[in-house]
Every structure is written in structure tokens, then in C-alpha cells.
UniProtKB/Swiss-Prot annotation:
Catalytic activity: D-glyceraldehyde 3-phosphate + phosphate + NADP(+) = (2R)-3-phospho-glyceroyl phosphate + NADPH + H(+); D-glyceraldehyde 3-phosphate + phosphate + NAD(+) = (2R)-3-phospho-glyceroyl phosphate + NADH + H(+)
The organism's taxonomic lineage, starting at the top: Archaea, Methanobacteriati, Methanobacteriota, Stenosarchaea group, Methanomicrobia
Residue sites binding D-glyceraldehyde 3-phosphate per the record: 140-142, 171, 195-196
Assigned EC number: 1.2.1.59
Protein name: Glyceraldehyde-3-phosphate dehydrogenase
Pathway recorded for this protein: Carbohydrate degradation; glycolysis; pyruvate from D-glyceraldehyde 3-phosphate: step 1/5
Organism: Methanosarcina mazei (strain ATCC BAA-159 / DSM 3647 / Goe1 / Go1 / JCM 11833 / OCM 88)
Main subcellular localisation: cytoplasm
């Protein structure tokens, strides 16, 4: 089998996870990753055997740090069939001309606007729409988590409306520059938040409104979800629908917080204590007439990683069936 050649531009929080997940597949391989500075992540990438690429202007800094380079970022892009752009939000747009010049396919993350790629992706919701595409945006962690629960409910019961309050982690565990440390911040204060329109980039017919706030934690996001459906249902019906989704995990056995979820991931031996699944508390599923409520936690560092692998597979036309790709990705990474 000829493997798809994948480059990761930006070996940071998402990029390093995507690289490892791609490398675990049998139909794609990493041909290079990029860093702009010779920090510890660059050193670890080299230690793990990844070919490392950097801007030509920074090659001297890498040489001084004793971290060998395989070439420039432009040279990495030229070698790839597809580039996963994991650079910080807003920077990816500036890279688009480089990808177009090289004639390679590109995936951006949810920090970029939908218009950049013209197609926003969630594996369960619209896999087939990404088949053969040159440009795709994998939606953000929060949007991914919401698509995963809205789509199967809509398919079986029909969704009339969705209302979500998102308690967002302030920043990632390794980020010492952001906050808050001792505050709760409505973000944005002017409602609704951007998450509803982002859901519509994948599921345009869904009536959804969202409100978000930042809280002083780094572990996970927490969603309070309210859905109104078109069909009579029970909590058991909702439980059954969620149970059919391989990327939804029910929290039980005394797990009552995001801290315990992360500890569970550690105890399971997950790499970087990643929890790729939506984490739903089944006891929170409460039905009143045709409305129901529940809590779910979202691990922002990892939830988009399997989605990105599926996006690669669709764009490279390695698998035409979304369900089969999801199964293949899950098995390879240990989900």
C-alpha cells in the first residue's frame, strides 16, 4: 500500500498529537513536522524520529541548539500530499498561498474562519462531503463535541432547537501567559457566542444558540446542553443513541469532575492523558416532554485529533465510508 504523505505545519498542542495519530495509521505517514523555534517540543520531535523543518531564517538557531533540520517549511510542503496546518489561529490563513503554490491539499484547525477552506468537517456529520476536497477546516474542540451529540439526535429524533452554555477552560496546561487565574469571564459578554454559527458551518439547518464563559481551569471544557426534539423520547432513548456513538464515553464509577476524567485517562495509559471522546454523565440526562438536558466534558487538547485523521482519509480518498474511517482511526490510536 502506498501511504499518503502528510506534513504537520506547527508541532504544538494539536500538531504533535496529530503527528502521532497519523503515524499510527497504516494508510498514511508523517514526512515532516515544523517548528519556528528550537524549543523542547522541537527536541522531542527529533528524538521521536520525525524529520524537522523550520523557516530558513531560523536555521541558525536550530543549529546552535543542536537540533538538526531536514530543510525549510517550504521544502516540507513540497514533499507532502497533504499538509495539516496546526499553527496558531489566524496564522494559517497566511500559509494558504504556500500550499496552493505547491499544489498540496491542506487542513486547517477551528481557529481559522470557515471561509478559508469553504468546508468545515466533522467525521460523523459530513464525512462524505470532504471526499476528494483540496481544502478542509476541522472545526474546534467545542464545535466538534457539539456536532457529535447533535447529529445522531437529529438523525433519529429530529432537533427543533439547541441551547448550550459552555464553561470553557481558560487555557491549555502548558500555557503560562493566559488566564484568568481568579475570575469567571463572560466570553463574549455580547450574546450569543460564536459556537452556534460554527455548528451551522457543519449542520446548517440546526437552530442553535450558545453562551460561553471562561473559568480558571486548564483541564477541560464543560457544556450544559439543552435540546428540544420533534419526537417523544425518554432518557433511555437518549442514552441508547449516545451509546451507539464510538466517540462518546459515559462517565460513571464515581467520576464527578473533569479532574477525575483526566486521572482516568492517565490510568488508562492514554498518551498525554488524552480523552478523545465526549465525556457525558448519563445521570445528567433529564427529559421533560420533548426537551432534554445533560452535561458533557470536552478535552480541548485531543478531541479534534481523530477527526483530523478522518479528514485526511476523506480528502485523500483512502476510504469512502465515514463509519469505516472512524472505526479504522479509533482502532489505530486505541480509542
Amino acid at each position: 500500500m502506498v501511504k499518503a504523505k502528510i506534513a504537520v505545519n506547527g508541532y504544538g498542542t494539536i500538531g504533535k498529537r496529530v503527528a502521532d495519530a497519523v503515524q499510527a495509521q497504516d494508510d498514511m505517514e508523517i514526512i515532516g513536522v515544523s517548528k519556528t523555534k528550537p524549543n523542547y517540543e522541537a527536541a522531542v520531535a527529533h528524538q521521536k524520529g520525525y524529520d524537522l523543518f523550520a523557516p530558513a531564517s531560523n536555521s541558525g538557531a536550530f543549529e546552535k541548539a543542536g537540533i538538526p533540520l531536514a530543510g525549510t517549511i517550504e521544502e516540507m510542503v513540497e514533499k507532502a500530499d497533504l499538509v495539516v496546518d496546526c499553527t496558531p489561529g489566524g496564522i494559517g490563513e497566511a500559509n494558504k498561498p504556500m500550499y496552493e503554490k505547491a499544489g498540496v491539499k491542506a487542513i486547517w484547525q477551528g481557529g481559522e474562519d470557515h471561509e478559508l477552506a469553504g468546508f468545515s468537517f466533522n467525521a460523523a456529520s459530513n464525512y462524505e462531503g470532504a471526499l476528494g476536497r483540496d481544502l478542509v477546516r476541522v472545526v474546534s474542540c467545542n464545535t466538534t463535541g457539539l456536532c457529535r451529540v447533535i447529529y445522531p439526535i437529529d438523525r433519529e429524533l429530529g432537533v427543533k432547537k439547541v441551547r448550550v452554555t459552555l464553561a470553557r477552560r481558560a487555557t491549555d496546561p502548558n500555557d503560562i501567559k493566559k488566564g484568568p487565574i481568579n475570575a469567571i469571564v463572560p466570553d463574549p459578554i455580547k450574546l450569543p457566542s460564536h459556537h452556534g454559527p460554527d455548528i451551522k458551518s457543519v449542520l446548517p439547518h440546526i437552530n442553535i444558540t450558545t453562551a460561553a464563559l471562561k473559568i480558571p481551569t486548564t483541564l477541560m471544557h464543560l457544556h450544559t446542553v439543552n435540546m428540544e426534539v420533534n419526537t417523544d423520547c425518554t432518557a433511555e432513548d437518549i442514552n441508547r443513541i449516545f451509546s451507539s456513538q464510538s466517540r462518546i464515553r459515559f462517565m460513571s464509577q464515581g467520576i464527578n469532575s473533569t479532574a477525575e476524567i483526566i486521572e482516568l485517562a492517565r490510568d488508562m495509559g492514554r498518551p498525554r492523558n488524552d480523552m478523545w471522546e465526549n465525556c457525558i454523565w448519563p445521570e445528567s440526562i433529564t427529559v421533560h416532554e420533548r426537551e432534554f438536558y445533560f452535561f458533557q466534558a470536552i478535552h480541548q487538547e485531543s478531541i479534534v485529533v481523530p477527526e483530523t485523521v478522518d479528514a485526511i482519509r476523506a480528502m485523500m480518498e483512502l476510504e469512502s465510508d465515514g463509519a469505516k474511517s472512524i472505526q479504522k482511526t479509533n482502532k489505530a490510536i486505541g480509542l
